[in-house]
Amino acid sequence: MANITKKWLRFQLLMASFVIFFGAGLSWAHSKQETTVPANNAVLTEAPAELVLKFDKPMRITKLALTDRFGNDYEVQRTDQMKHVLKLVAQLDPVPKGEYKVDWRGLSEDVHPMKGTFSFTVK
């Protein structure tokens, strides 16, 4: 019985060590969105010429979409070539007055899937 208890304790110690050394490192490696241009919920007097997303760690954006409140899609011209970047800049053709939402999805360097959204209004 004592032999089983020792094995069980060793196993628990091994698992705890794994979580401490590997689990914590993985959670620290995830990227997060720091800022956007336009800022979330910004009200603009003219349409932006570009969208900018800044991250705290490199991120590979796999999807970037701009839609209006009716669900119409607008073209964004990316400059990142699907590489890991700290700052993504996407050029926009002029958009009419209205409410817009930007949706993005991506992968951090540790291949953790990430996503986010922000909105702005052109008056």
Regions found by a protein language model. Give the residues of each.
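Short hydrophobic/aromatic-rich motifs at helix boundaries and adjacent loops
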Residues: 6-7, 33-36, 73-78
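Acidic, low-complexity Ser/Thr/Gly/Pro-rich repeat segments typical of extracellular/periplasmic
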Residues: 52-121
